[in-house]
Amino acid sequence: MLARLYHSLPVIRELDLNNRRLAQLHEALATGTSVQARHLLEWLKHTDPRYADSKRLLGYAFQACSQNGEDGIIQEIFRRIGVTNRVFYESGVGNGVENNTAFLLSLGWSGFWVDANPRFVTQLEKAGLLKSRLLQHRVAKINRENIVGILTDLGVPKELDLLSLDIDQNTWHVWGALGDSFRPRAVVIEYNGAVPPGIEWKVEYDAERVWDGTHNFGASLKAYEKLGRRLGYSLVGCDPFGANAFFVRNDLVGEHFAAPFTSENHFEPARFHLIHRMGLPNQMLDRMPVP
């Protein structure tokens, strides 16, 4: 009775109507962004000759649990270089349902998740993975000083298959701090696509600094190219939205990827205005048995 009376008030009806309008507008904008992203990818495939090169990774992008098509590119990298222990490590896993390794977990891989925000733990609880050895986790803020210690304490193998770093501000410094302590076969790194491909640039290091929402973050693709070369890795591609770069350890590159392995050759500009979940709402996928 009181509820019906409450909702009959003109001001409440107007608020409900406005909320419904806002929800419809948000849905329309999201759908429009998703359509734009699809059209962009289709347009690039038909107009950019790089997509015709089978050694490039751009044409293999698809989105299962990732944000920018990383799932497909990662699958293609390991189709070319093979897998060994099927172990991943990712820093910056977000909410636990949309990141670079959630899809691998559903395909039978095991690994390690670390993030400063504990929200991803809720997803692990829902999926029954909190006590599982398949996915170990830690809530921690990664920096240059603690990265090696955290990976060592978690028991991450030195030669895991995949390392993914997406910690916004200090990613360049953290990858550099790993040195020879860990030698993943492939690496996914967030880069700053606002900086042109030929310019070497990175933010000043401060362990307590966090991303302020501007384009003053991380490092340019050229800076990562040079860091990767120093660590023994080759830049083999970027995702179409200019968010992540992909590196493969030099001893595994062979003739599998498009040379030269430079930022000028593989750079994609930031297209963040087109990043949107394509399709149904995201969720952790059921885990398949390892073949």
Residue ranges: model-predicted function:
Residues L58-D153, P157-L165, G193-P196:
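SAM cofactor-binding core of SAM-dependent methyltransferases
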Residues E27-G82, Y89, V97, F103, ...:
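Rossmann-like AdoMet/SAM-dependent catalytic core
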Residues L134-Q136, H173-V210:
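A short alpha/beta connector and helix-capping loop motif
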Residues M1-Q24:
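Acidic, low-complexity intrinsically disordered segments
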Residues L124, L151, V174-L178, F247:
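Hydrophobic packing residues within well-ordered alpha-helices of enzyme cores
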Residues E90, W113, S164, A186-E190, ...:
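A structural signal for short, well-ordered beta-strand segments and their strand-loop junctions
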Residues S164-V174:
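Active-site glycine- and acidic-residue-rich loops that bind
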